[in-house]
Amino acid sequence: TTEEVPLNPEPRTECDSDNCAAGERPYAPNIAIENGDTIIAIGVVADVMFVIDXNCPLYCNFCIVADVMFVIDLVYEVGSFEALQQAIDNIMFT
């Protein structure tokens, strides 16, 4: 079963660390994300999940805990949503 992961209901419009909770940092707009990509990501410390897709502007509209480069490397390595979900399950439950 695949759970729907909601986007932040109140998107941030400025890349301002003051908008982030403790331990978070802004989404970095210089990360290469292709238009149309859907990325399901996990927090490295906490099991925080978020989605980046074509409907999200490529600026800081939410804050993240995860290491973005680790996340993107994982996405490209596994290649598909199903494989990514399995990889997430393996990381979170091992």
Curated annotation (Swiss-Prot):
GO process terms (BP): toxin catabolic process
Keyword Hydrolase listed: yes
Tissue: Ubiquitous (at protein level). Highest levels of expression in crystalline style followed by digestive gland and mantle.
UniProt entry keywords in alphabetical sequence: Hydrolase
UniProt note on regulation of activity: Strongly inhibited by the serine proteinase inhibitor AEBSF. Weakly inhibited by the proteinase inhibitors BSF and aprotinin, and by EDTA.
EC number assigned by the record: 3.1.1.-
KW Hydrolase (keyword) present: yes
A GO term for molecular function: hydrolase activity, acting on ester bonds
pH-linked activity: Optimum pH is 7.0. Activity decreases sharply with increasing acidity or alkalinity.
Source organism superkingdom: Eukaryota
Activity under varying temperature: Optimum temperature is 25 degrees Celsius and activity decreases sharply above 35 degrees Celsius.
Top-level EC class as recorded in UniProt: hydrolase
Subunit and interaction comment: Homodimer.
Role played: Hydrolysis of sulfocarbamoyl esters of paralytic shellfish toxins. Does not hydrolyze the carbamoyl esters of paralytic shellfish toxins.
Protein name: Sulfocarbamoylase-1
Taxon lineage: Eukaryota, Metazoa, Spiralia, Lophotrochozoa, Mollusca
